[in-house]
Amino acid sequence: MKDVAQSLFVGAMTARRTVALVTVAFALSVGQGFWAQGPLTLEAIALADSGNLSEAETVLNEALSGPESADAMTWYVHAYVLKERFVEEGNQPTSPQRNKALESLRECIRKDPQDRLEDWWRPLLLFLGESLLLDVQVEIRNIAPGQPVVAEQYFMQYAEIQRDLDPEVDTAAEWVLMQQQLGETAMTEAQALEKAGAGPWFELGTHHYTLAAEKNQDQYRSLFNLAVHTYNQGVREFKTAEDDLDAIDAALENASRHWLRASEFLESAITKDDTQAEGFEALAIVSTALLNQDRIEWCKAHIQELEGH
């Protein structure tokens, strides 16, 4: 279930972009005679091309503390070397090299107002953005009650990069999809736990589906899924009292509250898209559960009368 969810997430994220990910695989020495005039930058390029990344970074740090810091190419080379170190270290999400590479790349862009280096910095920026997107996918699977939602942190960095690439870009639909997948991951855990410990996972899933439903993208799906999981939580809570007659009244009351909320979510979903038959079918099921609960309450209130007393 989780792997399928992540595949959908990746597909939706990459389908939006018209520019495909271009791996930065070209040699730094290309065009160096025209762009990189500084001797330290040239030395760093030679070191990087020979695989001596740490030495190249040391030389670049010296270059950036002097006159060569005014050269956009020097900042680009610095970003490239840091990116290579990030890859060399295994693309670790917590690696400081990625953030440092982003800082240098943004400085390169600021010093290149005519975008003469765009064909160089854009692929590198795309690569760094995609690396963050991969971390979002991993952290969706790692979500847990009471823990920071790291996926959101990585997504915010990813969204900033998309704005670097295109100031007019809107990542709201991608953000909604991430919230849906966070919600679905939590709800799947709640379902797997059944009677024992489902509550915290259900609350976490509700939180993320609610965040998704608040945005004006794919609201029907967010509300419908939230309704289905809310109904199922009511069923789970009712089942906890199956073998405990003393607790069944409270369990039924709790379940009915979930079913009522589920019906409200479904009604809202249908107002967003009344062409989906599943919405009406689910509402019929929830309404039947509420009706049966009302019948039980009526029977309890008239039990003596029904027994002929």
Say what each PLM segment does:
Residues 82-127, 131-149, 187-207, 231-264:
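Short coil/linker segments at helix-helix boundaries
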Residues 74, 118, 168-171, 222, ...:
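TPR alpha-solenoid repeat register
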Residues 34-119:
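N-terminal leader/linker segments that initiate helical-solenoid repeat arrays
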Residues 68-69, 113, 163, 217, ...:
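Short coil turns that delineate tetratricopeptide repeat
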Residues 63, 108, 158, 212, ...:
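Canonical positions in the second alpha-helix
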Residues 20-31:
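Bacterial N-terminal signal peptides
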Residues 72, 176, 183, 220-221, ...:
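Helix-start (N-cap) detector for alpha-helical repeat units in TPR-like alpha-solenoids
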